[in-house]
Each structure stands twice: as C-alpha cells, then as structure tokens.
UniProtKB/Swiss-Prot annotation:
Residues 403-863 are annotated as: Pocket. This is Retinoblastoma-related protein. Residues 403-604 are annotated as: Domain A. InterPro entries: Cyclin-like_sf, RB_A, RB_B, RB_fam, RB_N. One of its GO terms (cellular component) is transcription regulator complex. It is found in: Nucleus. The gene is RB. GO terms for biological process: cell differentiation; negative regulation of G1/S transition of mitotic cell cycle; regulation of transcription by RNA polymerase II. It holds the Pfam family RB_B.
Length: 1012
C-alpha cells in the first residue's frame, strides 16, 4: 500500500512529517487502510451537536488509534527483539506528536474508539483482540507513570539542588526550575531500566515505588556532596541511626512507608544493571573512603567509583538511553522518558477515569457518591501513627496533601503489618466452624482456596520465554511476586471468613453453618474479593478489575453479595480499600449488572417473568461457573500437602450448590445485609439494641443471599429469594440515581435564569426522579447493555420538555461533564439494537445520546412522560427536532411514588447522648478543636488505634463524658507518680515548633504520619 492511499483519505496527512511510514510493514499498512475505510461511516456518525470536536480532530484521533491498533494487533507474537532489528521503531509518543495530539486527550478518546470499532477489530484480528490490544493496561500504566514521575521529582528536590548541576549554562529565558539536571535524568533512566529488566511483568505501583526509593538511595551515596540539600545528621530525614551512622535504607523506608526488604532487593537489582549496562565495577561501601558516605552506615551498601562524576555522567546517561531504546524499539508503547523532559506538552493536562485519577498527582475524593451512608465510616487513617521506641513522632508533624502514591504505600503497609503475620491456613476457630458442618469441609475449603489463588496469581510457565532484555531471573522475580500476593490474599480470606462465621453463628445461636460454608459461589466471591483488595493495594496494571471475576468464574453481581459483609467484618480495612470496594459496587449498579453475562439476569427471569423474552433475545444470561477441577487442570497448581478431594465434595461441585453450576438460570440473588439499615455512626448502646432487634426480625444475611432464587424468602410475604434480591438491588439503583439527579440539579441551578423559581427546580428534580423510578420498574429492558446515566440524561431532557423548562440537551451534557462519575462514552456511545426498532435497520450499533433518545427512549417511555402534562397534551413536544414518532398506546397506571429521598446534609448529626457526628474533614476539625479537648472527639479517618474505626472509640468517649470524676484534678507529687523527664519537656517544646513527640510515661498523642 502506498502513502498516497492515506493521503487521499486524509488530506491533512500530507503535512505530517512521516518517519519510516510510522514503522508499519506492508500488511500493517493494508490493515490500517482497511480499518480506516470501514470505520469512516462510524467516524461521520461520531460528529454530534453535543460535542465540540471538529471532523479533522476526530480524524486525527482515529488515525492515531488505528496506527496503535494496527501495530499492536498486527505485530508478531513470536520471536524476540533481534528479529527485524534492522528496522527503525517508532513510539506511540512520536505518532501522537506527528498528528498533533497529546497523551491525555488520546486516552480520553481511546475508550470511545474501542467501543465504536470493536466489531471491525474482532473480524480482522479475532475475538481476543481487546486482550491483545491492552488499551486499559496502557492507560493505567500512563497514569501510574505520571504519578511516579511527580513522586520522584518531589523526593529528588527534597534531597538535592536543582540548579548548578550541569556544566552547560541554561538559556537566559529559561528559569533554573525548568532545567533538567543530568543527575535527575540519570535516576529516572535507572528506574526505567529496573522496570524493563527487573519487574517486566508485574509493573504495579507499589513495586515501582520501591524501585524509586532504591534509586534514591543510590543517588544519595553517589551524587557529589556539594549538591546536597541535607546533612546525614538531619533528624527528620534520617531517623534510623546506629553507632556507625545513619541506616540509609531503613530511614528512607521509614520516611516513604516502603518495605525495607523490598527496597534492598531492588537495590541489588539496580546494582546488577549498573554492572551489566554501564560496566562499572562495584565495591563494598565499607572499604571506600569518600565524602558521600560520611555519617552513613556503609554495611550492605555498594559503591561504584566514578559513577556520577562529571567525566562519566554523560556517558552513563547515553548508555542507559541506548539500553532503553533497544527495549522499546518495536513495541509502539509510551516512551517513558517523556515524563522527565522539559517540554511536557505531549503529556497534556486534565484527568482520566472520570475524574477519579488526576494527572496532577493529587487525589480527588468523590464526595457525592452513593455509599456515604451505607458504609459505617472510613475506618482508617491515610497514614498510620508510627512511633519511635522512645515515643517521639517520626518526621515533621505537618499535614501534607495525600497523593495516590503515598496512599498506596500506606495501604501496602497495612498488608505488611496486619495481614502478612497471619497464618496461611484456617485458624483454630475457623477450623471449628468448618468441622461443625454436616461433614468436615476443612480440606475442601483449603483446596479450593489454593486452586483459585493459583488461577488469579499464576506462576510463569516453566517454558515461558523471558521478555527481550529482561534479566535471566526475571521469571523467578515474577513468581516470587505472585507467591507473595497469593499468601496475602489467602490470609485475608481466612481472616474475614472467620469473622463472618462468628457473626452468623451468633445470629443463629449455632455453629453449624453448612448452608453457607458448602456454597461454592460464596467461597469464590470471598476469594475474589480478597484477591481484588490485594491487587488494588498494589495497583497492578496487568490485573485490572474485572480480571478477578474472569479468573474465578463469577460475575460482578455475585461479588456484590459479599462486598458489604466483607467491609463490615474487617475492622482494620484501610479507608482507600473501602472506597475501592464501594466504587466497584457503584460500577456494578450503574452498568456492569446490566451487561451481557450478568447473573442478575438469571434472577430477573424469576423475579420478573415478563422480562425473560427480552433477556433471552439479547442473550444476557450468565454462563455456568467453570468446574473447580477444570480450573485446576488449566493452571500449574502444586497440590503437594493438600488432601484429595472427597467424593462427596466432587458430587457437590458437579451438581453445584443450589444448582449454581449446572443451571445458570438458578443463579444466586442479592441479599439484605444484617447491618445495611444502620446509621453511619451509632453509639454502642444503640448498636446492641439494633442487633437484638435484627436477631429477631432479620433472616441470616449471607445464607439467604446465596440461597436458591426460587426458594421462598425467609422474610415472609410470599416472595421468592430472587424477588427479594431484585427489589433490594433496584432500591440501591434508585438511591444512586437520586444522588446523581440531585448533583445535576445543583449544578443546573447556577445556569438558571432569574425568572425560574426554586419551586420549579424542586419540581424538576422530583419529576426526573419519579420518571426514572417508573422507567426502572416498567421499562426495565431499556437498561439492558446500557449505563443508568444514559437513562437519567434522557429523563432529564424529556421531563424538561414536558414541564416547559428551558433546558437544552447540550446544557444537560455540559453539566453532566462536571459530575465526578462522568465518562464521555456515556453520551457518545449508547447501545441500540435496530432489529427491534421501527426503523428499517438491522444489527446492533452504538449511537450518540440524542439518536438514542429519539429512536429508542421516546417511543418506549412517551406515555410515561405524558403523565406529567395535562391529559398528555405535551407528548408532541418531547422530541428533539431531528425526528418524530407516532404516539404509543395508553400508559398503564403508575404506582404512587414516594417523594425525592432525603440525602445526607452537612450539619452535625446527633447519634447518641453527648455524641455528635460532624461532616467536617479532619483537617478542619484540627483547626477548631483544641489539643486539650481532642480526646473527647472521634474524627473521621482518625482513631486512637491505627486502621481502626473512630466508632470503636465511642464507648470510651461516652464513658469519659458521663464519668463523675473530675477531668482536671490537682497535680500529684507523690513518689510513685513519676517525675517529668527532661526529654518530655524538650519534646513538648519540639511539638510547639510543628513536631510532635510522646514519651512512655504519658499516653501517646494522636499523630499522623506526613505524606511524601
């Protein structure tokens, strides 16, 4: 294929400096031309009146995506980097620069093209094209590198000067802060070498952060001392000291919440790379006499002569550049060196993932999420109160902005501190529950857990080829990583399973939990939830959700059955992991439960038989869970030491507990958690009253959740478990919709005209909510394969037209863009099946929100919207001018609906005598509460114990408030009272200067570790 073929399609491409024809061979060019030609009609339909993108801009985005897809999907899957080494590669960054795009904008549009061109890619490259394309992994990798580069920059600037480090003088118009230090660039290149060679498969955020800290340690002992901003005697920076000097690695790990063992391991890998790539000879630091090692303990440190001297630094950088070029030359991935370049215009600005991840590096908290009430509280601080042996607080007591990297490291510290020390087998108490079933199921539980964890965290195959350029033992490193993650997830699974069993046993007043503990789906959900939390802690790029669902054979709807119970039965679970589970449940409610293959549909055909035809027509039913033995046969699982599967268990796995495996139509349904009705914060007395009441009225939560959907609900009323579960599930969706509708109304208020009254705004909110509620119950099929926000947006416009509210669809979309959950594909790509529409079209497609509104939404819900107007007189005005439709039949009677649900406000809430809950963030609470009265408050995210809910302190607070003893008594100078030491006085003075300290003779102060 010639370039003229592309020039004829894209005239603007003639002005693009084409380097080696974008590194595509003839077949790739042919595929690219075919892909672009077949996608051109889709491209023309993509120009929507609600967007501002010009046709040429869309062509540039599509051309960049097609280049990336053709290169990624058309590349050979065999061979190594030596094949075709005579060709010149081109990175994704170079392609985007050629077509005048940046990375952030490219990744924002990437999901749109994946959906639009997906069917064409499937025909050209096979059904597994999306897995091979690795678009989600590439985007997550970009976000992680953006965060890591800023993390590295902050750390470097804290230790080293950023000016007067290069021989060349910067241009007069360039500030010193804009110049890039050669030492700074060397550190980033060494980190990239670690990423390429040492941990090539699992590039998770925690492992990468450990790598950055190891590189920082190498820089500290090699960068000339004249460029330091610190002294080795500085207490805030280097807290770990011994007689021979500062323990460098331990001090850095203390400061950055990293694992000392992992950082030492990374330093060994980095030293190997310096030896192999830079050809520098290592020597023991204890044998070297250099200014850089003064006051630093040299034990276990390696020093390289002339590594970062002025004479050798340029050559070292050049060699690292060549090594990186060789590693990425033909992959078409991101050139990760762009993150430390002076000109970062290629990076772009803004946020990805609907605002959940911000490229600026600062965490954005979605304050208007659904589950602010249903979760008892954020149970752990972002930073745990690590203390010295003598009680002195480590570091400077300054509340710093939490970043995604520092938060991930704090969460990883929770795994090391609370989960890793646990046994990797059932505890004696859990064994008691397993043995108390109708038969002893201990061996079955252990074997299942082993197989599932091996499926989620597999070892590298023995014959698996190492990635080109990797160190010889990189597969061994990957296997060690997988083994560590398996153990963490396994220990967490056993821990939470025990607490759940204890709660169920107390509720039933019996230890026989056969119905629950013999349910295969329940255990897989628990294992998947544990593994997902471990993956979320490490921010693993190659195992993004819903990977754990695919590995375990369950669906997102199944996982939702244990999310609430999992959170409530693990008190030490950090705040970020609770938010992660809540976000997963929100994703389930808004879209994943409505996708093809969701087990919710298996319950819907029982709870709502009228929907069975539509569910079968769209092929939505979930596939059966794979057999456990079949999963074991497809993974390399070592069963040494594990008992064989009993015959009774084999029969159960074949038949499936409650028909789970054999018949997908009898899938388990949603459940009502024992504690779901609890307030966000309650007093211990109220807790006991609620628990006593629910023990009498509420059936066992988990057992009923995983019961057969055709079984009558234990709650009575003649409902089946499927009906009860669907009703509860729909109520959660309605609540989520109410939160989002309210957010839209609040943002619309800023744009309204003065003539429109508050009453009209309230009426709009009420009507949109009521219409959504009715549509969910009477037009449920509109939600299949769609996002609930698409229905909300259409309901907004339809109600606005009926109510003669001056609001255009463009204004609705512009305000929706400001919502924290906004994703462009929600209003750009809406699923439609033309086979069942009135138009003479066939097949399935994705259209913009306006086309969906006119062609599908209005014909279905027009009678429901007409109820708002006088005798349905406004039916003709509810269409966008692009099309008109005939009237439907009369609308069936709608049930009387409750008013718009009350949402949490920002006023302090009294939850018990003398106890109020304030919504203020802890940073504002600190400014309002004096030090002397802090012990009377439980602040959100803080507690007297690390990773514990503040609600656990309410008993102590009540006792303190209701105590008759005087709080302030006379000073006791008795001999057994203990004297105030000089160190306490010194530490108290140190506290006044912005630091905090405690002593063993006084109760520890509530402190918070500073972020990095």
């Amino acid at each position: 294929m010639k370039m003229e073929d592309l020039f004829s399609l894209l005239p603007w491409l003639r002005d693009v400096p084409v380097q080696n024809q974008f590194s595509l061979d003839d077949k790739m060019y042919s595929d690219a031309l075919k892909l672009f030609t077949e996608s051109k009609s889709i491209l023309s339909n993509n120009v929507s009146p609600i967007g501002s993108t010009t046709p040429e801009e869309l062509e540039r985005y599509m051309f960049a995506f097609i280049l990336y897809a053709s290169k990624r999907l058309g590349a050979k899957t065999t061979g190594d980097a030596s094949e075709g080494s005579n060709q010149s590669g081109i990175t994704l960054c170079q392609k985007l620069k050629a077509v005048k795009l940046n990375l952030v904008d490219f990744f924002k549009e990437l999901p749109q093209f994946v959906v639009k061109i997906g069917p064409i890619l499937s025909d050209m490259y096979g059904a597994d094209w999306e897995k091979r394309l690795e678009a989600k992994e590439l985007q997550a990798n970009f976000v992680h590198l953006s965060l890591l580069s800023k993390y590295y920059k902050r750390a470097y600037q804290e230790f080293f000067k950023t000016n007067e480090v290069d021989k060349e003088v910067a241009d007069p118009g360039t500030s010193s802060s804009d110049s890039i230090s050669d030492y700074y660039r060397f550190g980033w290149l060494l980190f990239l070498a670690l990423r390429v060679h040492a941990f090539s498969r699992f590039k998770d955020l925690v492992t990468c952060t450990n790598g950055i800290v190891s590189v920082l340690a190498i820089l500290i002992i090699h960068i000339p001392a004249r460029l330091r901003k610190f002294s080795a005697l500085d207490l805030p920076l280097f807290e770990k000291k011994i007689d021979r000097g500062v323990n460098l690695v331990a001090s850095l790990c203390q400061k950055y919440d990293t694992s000392e063992d992992e950082v030492k391991h990374m330093m060994e890998k980095a030293n190997e790379l310096i030896l192999e790539i830079l050809k520098k000879n290592p020597c023991s630091a204890s044998l070297c006499k250099t200014e850089n090692l003064e006051n630093i303990d040299p034990d276990d440190l390696t020093y390289f002569e002339d590594l970062l001297e002025d004479s050798s630094l340029p050559n070292c950088i050049s060699m690292l550049e060549k090594d990186y070029d060789a590693a990425i030359w033909n992959k078409g991935d991101i050139d990760e060196r762009v993150f430390v370049n002076v000109d970062d215009s290629l990076l772009g600005s803004g946020s990805l993932s609907g605002g959940a991840i911000n490229i600026s590096g600062l965490r954005e908290i979605r304050c208007n999420g659904l589950f602010n009430e249903t979760i008892a509280s954020p149970l752990s601080p972002c930073r745990s109160p690590a203390l010295h042996v003598n009680g002195a607080r480590g570091g400077v007591n300054i509340r710093m902005i939490s970043t995604p990297v520092s938060t991930a490291m704090t969460t990883a510290k929770w795994l090391r501190t609370y989960i890793s020390p646990l046994p990797s087998k059932p505890s004696p108490q859990l064994e008691k529950y397993l043995m108390s079933c109708d038969r002893n199921i201990s061996s079955e539980v252990v074997r299942r857990a082993h197989i599932i964890m091996e499926a989620i965290f597999p070892n590298s195959a023995l014959g698996e080829r190492c990635i080109a350029g990797s160190l010889p033992n990189s597969n061994l490193t990957d296997n060690i990583w997988a083994q560590q993650r398996r153990l963490e997830a396994l220990k967490l699974y056993y821990r939470v399973l025990e607490t759940m069993c204890t709660a169920e046993a107390q509720l039933l007043h019996a230890n026989n939990l056969t119905s629950l503990l013999t349910n295969e789906r329940f255990h897989r959900c628990m294992l998947a939830c544990s593994a997902e939390l471990v993956l979320a802690t490490h921010k693993t790029v190659t195992m993004l959700f819903p990977a754990v669902l695919e590995k375990t054979g369950i669906t997102a709807f199944d996982l939702s059955k244990v999310i609430e119970s999992f959170i409530r039965h693990e008190d030490s679970l950090p705040r970020e992991l609770r938010r992660h589970l809540n976000s997963l449940e929100e994703r389930l409610l808004e879209s994943m439960a409505w996708e093809k293959g969701s087990s919710m549909d298996n319950s819907l055909i029982i709870a709502r038989p009228a929907l069975s035809a539509g569910i079968n027509r769209f092929g939505l039913l979930a596939e059966p869970m794979p057999f456990l033995n079949a999963m074991a046969a497809h993974i390399e699982v070592s069963t040494g030491g594990l008992p064989p599967l009993p015959s009774s268990c084999k029969h159960e796995f074949a038949a499936g507990q409650n028909g789970d495996i054999r018949s997908p139509k009898r899938a388990c349904t949603e459940y009502r958690s024992v504690l779901v009705e609890r307030n966000s914060f309650t007093s211990p007395v109220k807790d006991r009253l609620i628990n006593n009441l629910k023990q009498k009225l509420t059936p066992p939560a988990l057992q009923s959740a995983f019961a057969s959907p055709t079984r009558l609900s234990p709650g009575g009323g003649g409902e089946t478990c499927a009906e009860t579960g669907i009703n509860i599930f729909f109520s959660k969706i309605v609540k989520l919709a109410a939160v989002r509708i309210n957010g839209m109304i609040e943002r619309l208020e800023k744009l309204e005209k003065q003539s429109q009254t508050q009453q009209l705004r309230e009426q709009l909110r009420e009507n949109v909510y009521c219409r959504f509620h009715i549509i969910l119950n009477q037009r449920t099929s509109l939600f299949f394969n769609r996002h609930i926000d698409q229905i909300i947006l259409c309901a907004f416009y339809g109600v606005a037209k009926i109510s003669q509210y001056e609001l255009t669809f463009k204004e609705i979309i512009l305000n929706y863009r400001k919502q924290p959950q906004c994703k462009p594909q929600v209003f750009r790509s809406v699923f439609v099946d033309w086979s069942f529409s009135r138009r003479n079209r066939q097949g399935q497609d994705h259209v913009d929100i306006i086309t969906f509104y006119n062609e599908v939404f209005i014909p279905s819900v027009k009678p429901l919207l007409g109820e708002l107007g006088p005798q349905g007189a406004c039916v003709k005005t509810d269409l966008i001018p692009e099309s008109n439709n005939d009237k439907d039949g009369q609308c069936p009677g709608s049930p009387k609906l409750s008013t718009f649900p009350s949402l949490p406000d920002m006023s302090p809430k009294k939850v018990a005598k003398n106890v109020y809950v304030s919504p203020l963030r802890s940073s504002k609470m600190d400014a309002l509460i004096s030090n002397s009265s802090k012990s009377y408050y439980a602040c959100v995210g803080e507690s007297t114990h690390a990773f514990q809910s503040p609600s656990k302190d309410l008993t102590a607070i009540n006792d303190r408030l209701n105590s008759t003893s005087k709080v302030r008594g006379a000073l006791n100078f008795d001999t057994d009272a203990g004297l105030v030491s000089d160190s306490l006085v010194a530490n108290s003075l140190y506290l006044q200067n912005g630091n905090c300290a405690t002593t063993s003779s006084v109760g520890p102060l509530k402190t918070e570790q500073p972020d990095s």
